[in-house]
Structure formats: C-alpha cells, structure tokens
Amino acid sequence: MSETVSLHKLVKKAVHSKLSFKTFLGLFSQLNTKQVVQDGEYQTEILEIVQNPRNLNDKKITEYKVVLAIQLSLSSSEELKRFWGNLSKISLVGQVDYLIRLNKILKYEYSKYDKDIVRLLIKVQYCDYIVEVLDSFGDKKLSTEQKSLANHIVFFASSVIEHVVVKDEALVNDLVFQLATRLEGLRLSNLLDFLLLKSKNILSEDQIRLTDSSGSGEDKSSDLPTITTSLYKNLSVGSLSSAKQETYNETIKFLWLNKIMKSWKFADNESIFNNFVHNFIPSSDKNKNPYLTSFELIKATFKGFGYAVINNDDCYVLFNWKNFIITRIPVILSTLKFANVNDEETLERAVLNAFNSLPDSIVKVLTNLASGSTKVYDLRQIFIKSLIFNRLLPPVAFQKFFPMESKITQQVILSELAQYNHDLNLRRKFNDKLINVNSEFTSLEESGLLELCNSLPASLEYSYSRQIELSNAINDIIDEMKISREHEKLNRLLLSVMSNVQLTNILVFNSNPYVVLGKMIDYIDSENFRIDDDDENFQDVYSYCGVLILSIISIIEKFKIDLSTFNIKNSFALDYINNFYYRLCDDLTNQIPVNSDEEDNTIATNYNNLLIDWINALFDDSNDGLSDDLIKSISIKQIYKLIPLVYQQAITATSIGKIDFSILTNGIDYLSQVFLIPTTVSIINWLLSEISNKKTDAESLPVKVLSEIVKSNISSESGSQELSSLVFKIVVNICGSNILIALKKIKDWENSQRIRDVVSIVTANLDSNYVEKDLSLPESKSDININEQIKSHLVNFQQQADSPTPIHAFIHRFISDSKDQVLRVLLQEVTSYQKQNNEATKIFINLASYLVVSSSIDSVEDKKYWHGYLSNVSSSATEHKILKNSDKEFNSSMDYHYSSIFNDASSGASNDDDLFNDKSSKQLSSGKLLEQLRTKVNRYNNLLAKFNVIFAENQDPSSPWHKTVNTLADKLLDDINDLYI
C-alpha cells in the first residue's frame, strides 16, 4: 500500500466506490499493519456520521458507514473491542444510530457471524459499554438525548433476550443484571419494568426483588410507549355531536366520490354501488327497499358535483362527475328492484326528493352549467332524460319534474329517444372511415373520420354501452395497428381523437388513461420510424412519431397524470416526457465531466458539430435551409430531443444580442412544418417558464417568440394546412390554458395587441370546457396561514359552498395536490387535542384521518396490507420511503450532457437502484412495466406510507411526537377497519 494512503482516504474511497466489506477489511488490515490506527482517528473517520442528512446521497453515505463500522467490529475480537471502546466517545445521537442498526442485525442476521464474537459482544463489550455510558449520566436530570440512548440500550438488550442469541441464560443473566441495577439508579422505572418483563424467565426471584422498584420514575410517561386507548376512543366519530356527525358523513361522501372521479375507478358499477351502500347507508337500512339507497346515491352525487364545480376542480374531474351521473347512475339504478306497493317509495319519488333536498347553492350551480361558450344547461334535466332513455322513467316524467320547461316537450323527448335507440355500430363506422380507406387516394378530411369523431360526444352522451363500445373499438384498433405497423392510419386515428378533448375524455373514462397510455408508449418505444434513403415522404413518417408523442403528453397533461416518478429502462417515451416535457432540459448541461474518457469527448464533439449544422440550417440566411440529408442524418427520436435544445439556445443567443430577432423568426418559421410542430410543446412550455419565473412585459423576448410560434402555426398556408392545424390544435390543447394564465398575469396585458392576438387565437382553438382557471394564491392573500385554512376548509366544507372565494378553491386544489401537508396538520392537531379537547379539532382529525386512509387504499389487497402493517406497532416503514429523482444529488456524467440525445435508453447506471426503475424491461413491454410501477407507486407513495415513516421514526419514547403517532396509528387503523372496499 502506498505511503500516502491514510484511513481518511481509505474510507473516502470506500464510500465513493461502495467497496464490499471484504475488500474494505483487506485494505483496512493492510493499513493497520503498517501504521496502527489511533482511537481518535478511528472515531473521526470510522464512527462519526452525518447527523440529519440533507439529501438522499448523504443518507446513503451515512447508512453505508454505519454498516461498514459494524461489519468491521464483528470481524475479530480486536476490532470488536476497538468498536465498543470508542463508541461511547462519539455523539449520543450517533450512538443511537449504531444501536438501531445493531438491533436489526441481531434480529435477522446474527447467524451469519462467528458465535464466539457474538458471545464476547454480549458478555464483555456490551456490558462494559453499558457501565461506561450509564454511569457517566450521573445524578442530574437526563437530557432528551440521554433518555433516547438509554431507551435504545434497553431495546438492544431486550433483543438479546428475545432471540436468545447464544442460548446461554447465564451470559444473558449477567447483562440484564448489570443493566437493571443502573436503570434503577437513574430512576428510569418504566425502562426497568420493561426490561424485567422481558427477562422474567431469566432472572432469579432474588435478583428480581433486588432490582424491582416502584419508586418515582423521572418523566415516567415518556420512557415507554403510553397506552393511548382512552384518547383514541375519545377521538372516534361516535363521540362527535349529532350535528358534527352529519357534517362528517356528508364530507366523507364527497371525498370518497371525488376520489373515484380523480382515479378513474369506473370499471365496476356493482362494486361502486356496493361500496357506497356499505360505507354510507346505516346498517339497519341496508335490507330495506331500494328507495333509500337511490335517494342517498342521487343526492350524494349531485351535491358532490356541485361542490366540485364551486371549488373549481380540474376540468376532467368535472367531466367525470357529469358523465358518471348521466351514464353510470342510471345503470346502477336499473339493478334495483322497486316493489310497486308503496307509491311513496318509487324511483321517481326518490329522484324528486333527492332534487328537493339539495341546498340552494348546489341548485344554482346545477342549473347554470355551461357547455361550450354559450349554451347553458341544467344537469338535472340531462339526468332525467338519461333515466327516460334507459327506460327507468316514462317520457311523460320530464314534464312532471320540469313543468315550466317549454323547449323540451314530450315530442322532443320521443325524437331524441328514437335517436338514442338507433344502432351506431361504431366498429363498422371506424372500418369504413379508417381501416378500409386507401390513404394514398383519400385524404383524412375526405374519409369522414374527422366528422365522425367530432359527432361522437353528442351521440354517446347518454349511453353507457355506446361509450364502452367506443373505447373497445379504439383500443382494439391501436393494438391492430401496432401489429400491422400501419403508422399512417394510426396517425389519422390519433389526430381525429386527440384533437377532440371531450372524445378523449370519454375514451379514457371508460378504459382508464393508463391503458391508453400503455398502448401508445409501447408503440413508440417498439418502433424506430426508419425510412428508406429514397423515401420522399419521410417527413410524413417522422410526423407520425411526433403525433404519438403529442398524444401521450396530451393525456398526461389534460388528465393530470404524473409520470415524473416513473423510470423504465430503454423507454424513449418516458425519457422524453421526463427530460424534455417535465424538466425542459434543465437537468442537461454542455459541460463535459472532468473524468471523461476519449469516447466521451468524441460523443460531445459529434454533438457540437451536429448542433452547429442544425443552427446554421435553421438560422443562417446564407444556407439553403433544412436539407433532406441533414434531417435524415439522425433518427426522428433524436430530432425531437435536439430541436428544443437548438431553439432554447437560439432564444438565449437573441436575448444577449448574438443574433437578431429577424434571424430568430426565420428559424421559428420552420416550426410550422408538420414533423417539427410536436417539438413546439417543449419550446412553448420553456417560454412559459421564462415568462412566469422572470419579470416580463408585453415586449419581452419570450412573449414575442411565443407570439411568433402561435401565429406561424395557426396561419400556415402550406399544402398540409389541414394536417398541420390538427397537429397544432393538439399542442394548443396541451399548452393553451397555461398560455392564457401566464399571459394574463403580465401587467396591463390588455393594452398589448400582441398578447391580445395570442389570447384570441388560443381561446378560439381551445374547448371552453377544458380551460383551466388560475387557482394560484392572490398576492393580497399570500400571508394566510395555510394550515389553518386546510383545517377550516375540511371542517366547514359544506358551509363554504354558500359563499365561495378564490382562497377556498386554492385550498381545495392545494389539499388535492399536497396531501403531505394535510398529514402534517393532522399530526399537529392530534398533539393539540391531547392538551385541549376541542370539537372543531376533533372533527378535523376524523376528516383528515379518513382522507389519509381513503386516498391510500385502492383495493382489498391494499386494505389487508395496511391493516396488517399498522397492527404491528413495532414495524419500521423507512424501507418504503419512495425514492424520487428530486431527492437525488446531481452527478456529473455524460448521462447529463446534451449529447445524451444520442441515447435511446432513458436511464443510465446512476438510476439502477431507484425503487421505480424496473430491471426486467427486456422481458416486459413499457406498457406492462408502467402498470407494474404504478402499482408500486400507489402502494409506497401514499399518505399511509408517509405516516408509517413518521411512525417508525418516533417510536423512541422520548420523542415529542411519540404519543401523537401512536394515538394516530390507532385512529387510522380504526378507519381502515371501517372502510369497506
């Protein structure tokens, strides 16, 4: 070993390279032979660890060092003595970390180690450590850190007793006796009682009498887990006043139904209805006639929809509520058997009474719903028509409900009923207008496919069976196209469907967006879209790839699907979404790593040369523009990664005066070419981030560039105007709401003709039912107490509907998007309730606890899992802490260089141990992997999982949160038991 090697360098290398223990032991032995490691150096370099690691990387280093030190200590008697002799010299918190890890090793891995070493640890070294540490505490009042260390010393000893590591009672007897006498001296009576309970079969009666003491213990309540049963029972729903119980029941109905609307759980009507009945209908009423269940279901869904509208829920959520009411509720009601004995308990009466029970604030919402920019409708009328069309009510019933409605007569109802009963045969229509069409001679417009798709939302509005037929037809066609590789026909289908957001919503409502996403991700990942060198239509083929990308992004954007935690190896689609849509290339750099090799430098040089060629072609007037050879020089997937980088750099160059704006606009004109239009999604989103993050005005460069992109695509007069307009319409569907929000935040935007033009163009091309509102917190309200607002919002949920404010909508969205904060507030309120019994606090705890449970459990398997997990109070949840990309420290490597566009694989080696990076991608398709990873996300990245981490971290009785988390664990377990699924 080189003379320059020190323990510091050895440990640093071990941590950086993640050396195996065997390798480290060999190197350490060599070092120790040449120069004996001194105690001070051992403590500093081996034992001392980072407290409260700031990020995931620091935490991994800390865990690695702890395990390394323990493994080293168990390698020989000399190292064991060195470890225990020095452990007491480091911080008390550090000692606790080592005892926790040793405890786990003792429970699950002790058989791996030499029995004589383990005997020596228990009989000599641990006993000596106990004597040294506990005797050093003296007679003063113990600090929190000292109590914590004493707790873990006892917990480690109890593990020795429970697992009878060496099956030698005499050996364990000595350990227990030494520890018990010192606990008595420190007046830690709860810990002493705990130890004696664990060791009652080991100590003699004389020893127990000698150590048994009922003297006053110091802070007795904080030394061991406190029984929280009485407090937990006082928190139950049954302890609420009758008025508060009614508030609780009405609110959780909304939370339960709204979760269905957000999570696409529409597949099983019978299951939805059964769950509703078991969760919300009193058990004594469940076997009565169906009048009550019909009344409660109709009332709950209409009130829920009204609350969602009042709180400005996402546009797709509002559509899902409406579609569920119109198409699913009639199907559910059709399964009920109304006995025509009592005229007061008919379906008609149930509907009427449900309508009459709705608050005025909800009725006001239901009667003034907008469809499109001008049409106003009453959802109650639409629902009655659906009941008539589904033969649950006679046509004359409409006038009974709405006698003052003159436009919708019985003749109108009968006419619409006849149309409803007409057989659409959607698969045959798609065959006629897509499958059997010769694309070489018939354009998309001439085929009638666009016209068909645009007519379908109205044709399918009332029909559950037709919507299912549509979803099955489209999904089947996508599967068939993947097999036959008919890119052009799939392109036509996607253009026709994705340019109509309402039709897309119907599709994903009835087949789940993840199913559709999986099919499209599979398609694009398995296809390279290569063309022959002499293919003159190669730009068309390239555009097919772009439309697939836009379709995927359109679904995740419009339906708020977060794929940022998913990482599938070799998936171009997920790599593109994460790096070029979510992150907008922000995690890429032009810096070459210091440790780069010759191959890395060659790759970077090739990238720079390619970038220069494209910049010259796009922005240099002296060139002939984009040549076919340049376009074909790289794959279309690489082009879609390169173009956003090119334009970001060109815009940056313009902002610092390196190129003129006129030159930039010449390059922007190329973005109206059909195969390049899909790249504008990333460019526009990047521009919007520039507008939002920097103080901009109407004359700022990002606003000007955005205006040029929008105008050049909308006003294009090329031969493919129809096609390019459809492609850009999908872009507008994706970015349009964000464009309007960002531009309207600019001061005096109304005075800018440029901004008004963009707003007008975008608005004209957006479906008005899918324009998201700006729900950011008003600047005048930026100082509000978020925690208090969360509490108030849940407790006063129904009352707020009478006088809604922007803050209510903001908090409603905040709770939906930031459930972690709800958990933090819940913990604070449970702590507060222990000190002051408050009715408002109690109902909030019940509502927030229900929200935690209901948002985390999607299936019977989930319920069994979490019931079992929380039932075992000693379980640790730290292993389930989700690893997100945002938690990772940035590592400088070629994977983060701009030249990574040459890589079709999405993940480098640095991501291989990510929880959601599945290594079986070679065996399974991206779509199948996506479904598997989504299951993992749902299980390990929910509020119960997050609480479980907090619970495990606060099992130390000295923790200020100890009593709180145990009380809340009981409450959550009770709510899990009560949840029927």
Swiss-Prot record:
Pfam families named in the record: Med5
Purpose of the protein: Component of the Mediator complex, a coactivator involved in the regulated transcription of nearly all RNA polymerase II-dependent genes. Mediator functions as a bridge to convey information from gene-specific regulatory proteins to the basal RNA polymerase II transcription machinery. Mediator is recruited to promoters by direct interactions with regulatory proteins and serves as a scaffold for the assembly of a functional preinitiation complex with RNA polymerase II and the general transcription factors.
Family under the similarity heading: Belongs to the Mediator complex subunit 5 family.
Subunit structure of this chain's protein: Component of the Mediator complex.
KW Acetylation (keyword) present: no
Compartment(s) of residence: Nucleus
A GO term for molecular function: transcription coregulator activity
InterPro entries on file: Mediator_Med5_fun
GO cellular component: mediator complex
Source organism of the structure: Scheffersomyces stipitis (strain ATCC 58785 / CBS 6054 / NBRC 10063 / NRRL Y-11545)
One of the GO BP terms on file: regulation of transcription by RNA polymerase II
Name assigned to this protein: Mediator of RNA polymerase II transcription subunit 5
UniProt entry keywords in alphabetical sequence: Activator, Nucleus, Transcription, Transcription regulation
